[in-house]
């Protein structure tokens, strides 16, 4: 990892090989639910809408203590050539501002609830709204959200709940990682995050520590099957583990496949402190992980797509979930000598948490439910051909060539030694004969 070398130059200006596939959920029984003839919303997956994630590494500094500090920035760019669906299509979706704010105020006093209900009635806010796909992703606002963000900015710090806008709005952080030959087993794992040894999301250091975490662009070197990798994605709000699954062959190289376990979002059974529920809150069912600290305290939890491996009682609160382990699980394929990921795929679903909102008449039918908002898949589809060629030379060609070259050098060295000994012996023999010849010459001569 030095300027001018291929690994550094590839990392500093990474090729755009990460695709973001966004899936949103459309409410298909909008009229029936609004008129009360049906009490459970039916969701239909719409997508994918495909974006390319642009990654930028800037302000790069090599530190004297064997670390590298840089600022990482990510943004999503729509790819028209890869899409068949229009961003102008209409959706029927939950009113995130109304449901989120009533859930946030679920424990408020009677007077707060009364005043809020008056505001909602005056603005004619409904629990379901019609909106374009583009606005749902990038520009989701309404009069209630604008009003609240101005009146109580400490409680409502944003006036735009576009889901991709919330993910990428503040996706710029300073990261310090270990590099150098003395850090093989912790190569490119975090030492500091925004100048601290913790993320700042959790009060418990076990959940909040940055140690061993990696952003997934590179993993540590000399990866073994016994290693547990630690992947950090900001919108997951914590580090998630990856475990060895099997050996594979990728691009002609021997690789290891690590997977994200299906119980990743399950709470620990031993009673230890978990990283899935905020202190003081009622624990979420298995398969749901709190992410509100990463989204301005907006009540949201993460899960695997379509509630895969989530408590069935949660899945049955809505219609339309179709979990598929093959489609919705995650993995990464790594070349173990260098720790370079050759391919990776991971899915995550964001769900709105609606607490007991019986005190708010427009939304009381949503009380104590988890409503899927969207799910996205991050797919690193490969690495550039020049990097493939370099990797193949380093991990396949070079070891074999090294053995042959070493053998040739041994033969050459032995031959040169033999020639040297032979020449030395010839010179020594000539010297002896010359001495004998001079010693036997007649004195008269």
Show which residues each predicted segment covers:
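Extracellular or lumenal secretory-pathway regions
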Residues: 1-254, 260-445
């Amino acid at each position: 990892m030095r300027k001018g070398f291929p690994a550094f130059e590839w990392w500093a200006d990474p090729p755009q090989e990460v695709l973001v596939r966004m899936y949103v959920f459309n409410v298909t029984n909008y009229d029936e639910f609004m008129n009360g003839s049906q009490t459970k919303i039916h969701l239909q997956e719409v997508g994918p809408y495909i974006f390319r994630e642009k990654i930028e590494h800037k302000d790069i500094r090599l530190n004297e203590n064997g670390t590298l500090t840089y600022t990482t920035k990510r943004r999503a760019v729509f790819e028209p050539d890869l899409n068949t669906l229009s961003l102008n299509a209409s959706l029927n979706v939950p009113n995130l501002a109304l449901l989120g704010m009533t859930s946030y105020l679920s424990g408020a006093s009677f007077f707060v609830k009364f005043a809020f209900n008056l505001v909602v009635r005056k603005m004619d806010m409904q629990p379901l709204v019609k909106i374009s796909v583009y606005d749902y992703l990038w520009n989701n606002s309404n009069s209630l959200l604008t009003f609240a963000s101005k009146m109580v900015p400490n409680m409502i710090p944003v006036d735009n709940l576009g889901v991709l806008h919330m993910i990428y709005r503040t996706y710029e952080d300073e990261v310090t990682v270990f590099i150098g030959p003395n850090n093989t087993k912790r190569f490119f794992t975090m030492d500091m995050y925004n100048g601290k040894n913790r993320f700042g999301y959790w009060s418990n250091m076990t959940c909040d520590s940055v140690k061993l975490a990696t952003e997934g662009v590179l993993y540590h070197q000399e990866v073994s099957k016994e290693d547990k990798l630690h992947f950090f994605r900001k919108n997951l709000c914590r580090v998630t583990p990856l475990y060895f699954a099997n050996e594979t062959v990728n691009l002609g190289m021997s690789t290891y496949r690590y997977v994200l376990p299906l119980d990743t979002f399950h709470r620990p059974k031993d009673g230890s402190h978990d990283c899935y529920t905020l202190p003081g809150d009622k624990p979420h069912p298995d398969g749901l992980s709190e992410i509100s600290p990463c989204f301005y305290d907006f009540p949201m939890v993460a899960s695997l797509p379509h509630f895969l491996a989530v408590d069935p009682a949660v899945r049955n609160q809505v219609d339309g979930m179709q979990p598929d382990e093959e489609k919705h699980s995650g993995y990464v394929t790594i070349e173990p000598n260098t720790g370079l990921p050759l391919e990776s795929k991971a899915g995550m679903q964001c769900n709105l948490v609606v607490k007991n909102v019986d005190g708010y008449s427009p939304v009381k039918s949503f009380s104590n439910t988890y409503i899927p908002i969207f799910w996205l898949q991050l797919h690193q589809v490969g690495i550039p051909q020049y990097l493939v060629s370099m990797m193949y030379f380093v991990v396949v060609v070079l070891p074999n060539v090294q053995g042959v070259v070493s053998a040739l050098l041994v033969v050459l060295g032995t031959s040169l030694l033999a020639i040297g000994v032979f020449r030395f012996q010839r010179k020594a023999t000539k010297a002896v004969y010359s001495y004998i010849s001079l010693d036997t010459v007649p004195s008269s001569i």
